């Protein structure tokens, strides 16, 4: 008769003949064969289970072994060629289990530590990042960004005032120099006095606006050309706000009104000796133009003030909503901390 025994610890079995002597009695031989068969069947089941576990661990750990290659030291395998020894079979199966377990442990290395990117960031990090990104437009209602917007508006006003004032004052000076008056003119003396006063006021107002623009604009241009919101406090536009508004009003409102009056008086002085109706016609045409100009100026300034008021109101509402949200978040955070403290105290972690 033949029984199955292990030839090595890799799970390969080879049938070997069990020698049976004729000197042993038949009953003893049958009991020995039954005992040996039971031991061999138990050993065969154990070896098959260990082989299946090793194959499963090798299949599942193949990907981890590619990512984390570990060079394990080979373990010496002990071969046993004993045909019937149960003790040697137990030792071989135990050695096979230890080798399989050690190989499976080497194939599954410990997971890497969590990276610093996945770790929790402190509470002040988000606030600092949001405040440092004001230049990109993410914090549009911060005091620094609002000051930067005022800086840009003041810069535009000063540029417009300087150009307008230089142009109109130059025209007034040329008109006063080029006008030709004779001693025997029929122009009323009052009209000549009005012409002199209007021309002087026109040049003085535009020169004042031009002086303010010329003095303040370089300091503002220096900060604007740096393109950095963090340097906005170095600009004098906040302290010199009233001077900038004065230059803007002198150049666009008062200066233009005086320029229209200058045209009417100049037409009267120039054409009165030649044709009095021509002088009166110039004044008649200029009256509706002056009315339209004044109406447009009033409407424009009212619209501008209304727009500023709406923007200010919307900004205040957003600030109120932001304040309420911050208070609600702070209250929720405080409640969570208190609840966690009560839970820890109840569990006995904190006494």
Curated annotation (Swiss-Prot):
Which keywords does UniProt give here? Answer: Calcium, Calcium channel, Calcium transport, Cell membrane, Ion channel, Ion transport, Membrane, Transmembrane, Transmembrane helix, Transport
Ranges of Low complexity compositional bias?
22-33, 80-93
GO BP terms: namely: calcium ion transmembrane transport; positive regulation of calcineurin-NFAT signaling cascade; positive regulation of calcium ion transport; store-operated calcium entry
Has keyword Nuclease?
A: no
Q: Where are stretches of biased composition, namely Polar residues?
A: 1-21, 94-106
Record Pfam families = Orai-1
**TM regions (residue ranges):** 164-181, 192-212, 249-269, 278-298
Catalytic activity reads: Ca(2+)(in) = Ca(2+)(out)
Renumbered residue ranges of the record's region Disordered = 1-39, 71-141
What is this protein's function per UniProt? Pore-forming subunit of inward rectifying Ca(2+) release-activated Ca(2+) (CRAC) channels. Assembles in hexameric CRAC channels that mediate Ca(2+) influx upon depletion of endoplasmic reticulum Ca(2+) store and channel activation by Ca(2+) sensor Stim, a process known as store-operated Ca(2+) entry (SOCE). Regulates transcription factor NFAT nuclear import.
The protein's name is Calcium release-activated calcium channel protein 1
Organism of origin: Drosophila melanogaster
Task: Provide the gene name from the record.
Answer: Orai
């Amino acid at each position: 008769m033949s029984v199955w025994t292990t030839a090595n610890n890799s799970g390969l079995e080879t049938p070997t003949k069990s020698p049976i002597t004729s000197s042993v009695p038949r009953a003893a031989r049958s009991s020995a064969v039954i005992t040996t068969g039971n031991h061999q069947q138990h050993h065969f089941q154990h070896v098959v289970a260990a082989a299946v576990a090793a194959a499963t661990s090798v299949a599942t750990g193949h990907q981890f072994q590619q990512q984390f290659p570990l060079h394990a030291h080979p373990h010496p395998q002990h071969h046993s060629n004993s045909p019937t020894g149960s003790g040697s079979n137990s030792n071989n199966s135990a050695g096979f289990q230890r080798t399989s377990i050690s190989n499976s442990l080497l194939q599954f290395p410990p997971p890497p530590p969590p990276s610093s990117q996945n770790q929790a960031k402190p509470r002040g990090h988000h606030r600092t990042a949001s405040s440092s990104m004001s230049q990109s437009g993410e914090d549009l209602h911060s005091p620094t960004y609002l000051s930067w917007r005022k800086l840009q508006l003041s810069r535009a006003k000063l540029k417009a005032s300087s150009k307008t004032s230089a142009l109109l004052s130059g025209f007034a000076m040329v008109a006063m120099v080029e006008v030709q008056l004779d001693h025997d003119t029929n122009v009323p003396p009052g009209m000549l006095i009005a012409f002199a006063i209007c021309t002087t006021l026109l040049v003085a107002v535009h020169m004042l606006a031009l002086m303010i623009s010329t003095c303040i604009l370089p300091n503002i241009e220096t900060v604007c050309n740096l393109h950095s919101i963090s340097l906005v406090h170095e600009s004098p536009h906040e302290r010199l706000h009233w001077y900038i508004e004065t230059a803007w009003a002198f150049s666009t409102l008062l200066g233009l009104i005086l320029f229209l009056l200058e045209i009417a008086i100049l037409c009267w002085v120039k054409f009165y000796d030649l044709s009095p109706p021509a002088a009166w016609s110039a004044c008649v045409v200029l009256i509706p133009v002056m009315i339209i100009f004044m109406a447009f100026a009033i409407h424009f300034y009212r619209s501008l003030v209304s727009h500023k008021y709406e923007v200010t109101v919307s900004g205040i509402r957003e600030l109120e909503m932001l304040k309420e949200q911050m208070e609600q978040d702070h209250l929720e955070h405080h409640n969570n901390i208190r609840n966690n403290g009560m839970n820890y105290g109840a569990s006995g972690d904190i006494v």
